[in-house]
Regions:
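Active-site beta->alpha loop and helix N-cap motifs at the rims of alpha/beta catalytic domains
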Residues: 2-155
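Catalytic alpha/beta core domains of metabolic enzymes, predominantly
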Residues: 133-187
Length: 187
């Protein structure tokens, strides 16, 4: 079991409650007005966040927010807002490696790193991202087990065993895993 920003995560089933993760600021999210600039309706975003927190209180299941951003400028706007209004852990979810690096620098400079879970490292993540994670002392990351080499769930363990040492070398001590289940019949 890990503790991330005061929240217990993972461990043996039944010892800590399952954590709910809700996404915000994704492409098409109703609160986003301009995804490139990170402009959004703050009142509506806070309402949606409070609803998630209420659900967490009602169910006893802790909540995290997957903060999705198109670039580092948008990420900075979303992060500043979220850090001001909630104590919840935040998943940093940005596709572009350059934007990930810029955002990690911003998070480090603003003193937010203890609240952040990097989402995510995958088999194609470059060495530059691992170096940056170590440099900014990010302890929390998700390993995304998505690879054309390891499609079946039966061989995801081999991929995980390849990725764990790299993450640990980068200073990631709290490793979460996204196994990426693909429902082939629906494709």
């Amino acid at each position: 079991t890990y503790e991330i920003s005061g929240m217990k995560v993972g461990g043996m089933p039944g010892l800590a409650p399952t954590v709910m993760v809700g996404s915000m600021f994704y492409n098409g999210h109703t609160v986003v007005k301009n995804a490139t600039k990170g402009l959004f309706n703050k009142i509506e975003a806070e309402k949606q966040l409070r609803k998630a927190e209420e659900s967490s209180d009602m169910t006893g299941l802790p909540t995290m927010v997957d903060l999705i951003a198109e670039n580092s400028q948008a990420a900075a706007n979303y992060l500043d807002f979220m850090v001001d209004i909630t104590e919840l852990p935040l998943l940093l979810d940005i596709v572009s490696e350059s934007a990930q690096i810029e955002s990690l620098d911003y998070i480090y400079e603003q003193g937010m790193m203890d609240r952040i879970i990097f989402n995510s490292l995958n088999p194609h993540s470059k060495e530059t991202i691992y170096k940056k994670l170590k440099e900014v002392q990010c302890n929390n990351a998700i390993l995304l087990l998505h690879s054309t080499k390891y499609i079946l769930s039966s061989n995801k363990d081999a991929l995980l065993q390849e990725m764990i040492p790299k993450a640990q070398e980068a200073g990631i001590s709290n490793i979460l895993v996204d196994t990426v289940v693909i429902d082939i019949p629906t494709l």
